[in-house]
Regions:
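Conserved RNase H-like, two-metal-ion catalytic cores of nucleic-acid enzymes
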Residues: 1-56
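Metal-dependent phosphoesterase core characteristic of DEDDh/y 3'-5' exonuclease domains
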Residues: 21-34, 61-174
Length: 174
């Protein structure tokens, strides 16, 4: 089984991200590899989605792991890729959902009385001693508008690494 850790950042003009927001960065990492960050500002959204999906197709026995990927990242990728005509919604769902994605936020729900509150990645990371020092996700739009792409790259990269640490912690404590 090849584990692939995933995080996506969007340009969200509103207070809360939506499935229609533009994807500005996709970061992923195979378990024994380094983090790859695909950046919209170096190409465009359609190109980074196409490259990511092509990479996924090449992986045998894939398991995609992320924090809140079942409620946000994967539906967002499916919606945006479909909107760009990269593939049909059905093909995208088979590609991304058939490998049984693992969502670290969902894995913690029973221990949190089935409430999502308090299960943000930064909060979970702090509890396991894996705190990050990058800009908060709420600043991504501002950083993008300012052209501070380094901060966004560091943020999405750290989110992937933190998700991997959280997954390994959850797997260890059972």
């Amino acid at each position: 089984m090849t584990r692939l850790f995933l995080d996506v950042e969007t340009y969200s003009p509103g207070l809360k991200p939506t499935y229609d927001d533009r994807i500005i960065a996709i970061a992923y990492k195979q378990e024994d590899g380094s983090v790859t960050v695909l950046k919209e500002w170096e190409s465009d959204e359609k190109q980074i989605l196409t490259r990511f999906l092509e990479e996924i197709k090449r992986i045998d026995r894939l398991s995609i792991i992320g924090h809140n990927i079942l409620r946000f990242d994967l539906p967002l990728i499916i919606n945006r890729a479909s909107a760009h005509g990269i593939a049909s919604t059905g093909d995208l769902m088979r590609l991304l959902l058939d490998p049984y994605p693992i969502d670290t936020i969902q894995a913690q729900l029973p221990a949190n009385n089935f409430f999502f509150k308090g299960l943000g990645l930064a909060e979970c990371a702090k509890r396991i001693g894996a705190e990050t020092r990058t800009c908060p996700g709420s600043e991504i739009k501002t950083r993008y508008d300012e052209g501070d792409y380094t901060a966004i790259t560091e943020h999405v990269r750290e989110d992937v690494l933190t998700t991997e640490k959280l997954f390994n912690y959850l797997a260890q404590v059972g």
